[in-house]
């Protein structure tokens, strides 16, 4: 009888730790609020730093679990969880398609470093998901494809410097279809031309472009 095996109450902490291990993309780290009241917040140590993790709520899980090809727009004001959903979706898709590459674009170096830290904890076996600002991505392209990077221009006119690298990348890189999925956080911080340039690095078919 199945009831024999289910007679004892589940240990909520153990269940939460198990889910964090097998579905890390369903959790948010170091969040101030308790998102999902069905699960307790758990605390753990990684590399001598203490972290807390809470499972996403049902609405956020719904967006995280959906895998739709094409362009997807996620709207919402500041503090509504768009960045949390974005990272969750990016990790989910990277785990579902380990043979393909994915990339997240953010508008600031601070957020970039923060998400990289979270990614290192939540996606321990990561070798196919990158997080960049537009400038760090362009610097990577410059190094890989021997683009001419005039660092004097970088100090004098940052915007002109980036535009110059974008122009070179368009002319030099013949096959730009590098990523199955691209995720752009705080898209209002990017120019239309920059988003168009970023989009050129998607696969031609069966691609995913999420804009937040």
Can you say where each PLM-predicted feature lies in the sequence?
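The feature marks helicase ATPase cores and/or their adjacent C-terminal helical subdomains
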Residues: 1-212
């Amino acid at each position: 009888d199945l009831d024999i095996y289910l007679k004892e109450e589940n240990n909520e902490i153990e269940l939460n730790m198990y889910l964090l291990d097998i579905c890390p993309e369903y959790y948010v780290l170091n969040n101030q609020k308790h998102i999902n009241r069905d699960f307790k917040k758990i605390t753990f140590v990684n590399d001598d730093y203490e972290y807390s993790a809470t499972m996403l709520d049902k609405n956020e899980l719904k967006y995280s679990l959906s895998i739709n090809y094409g362009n997807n727009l996620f709207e919402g004001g500041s503090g509504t969880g768009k960045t949390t959903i974005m990272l969750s979706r990016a990790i989910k898709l990277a785990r579902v398609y380990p043979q393909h590459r994915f990339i997240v674009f953010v508008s600031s170096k601070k957020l970039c470093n923060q998400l990289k830290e979270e990614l290192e904890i939540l996606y321990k076996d990561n070798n196919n998901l990158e997080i960049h600002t537009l400038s760090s991505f362009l610097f990577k392209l410059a190094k890989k494809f021997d683009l001419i990077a005039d660092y004097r221009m970088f100090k004098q006119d940052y915007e002109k410097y980036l535009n110059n690298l974008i122009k070179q990348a368009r002319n030099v890189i013949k096959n730009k279809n590098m990523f199955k999925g691209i995720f752009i956080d705080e898209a209002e911080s990017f120019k239309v031309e920059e988003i168009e340039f970023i989009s050129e690095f998607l696969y031609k078919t069966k691609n995913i472009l999420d804009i937040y």
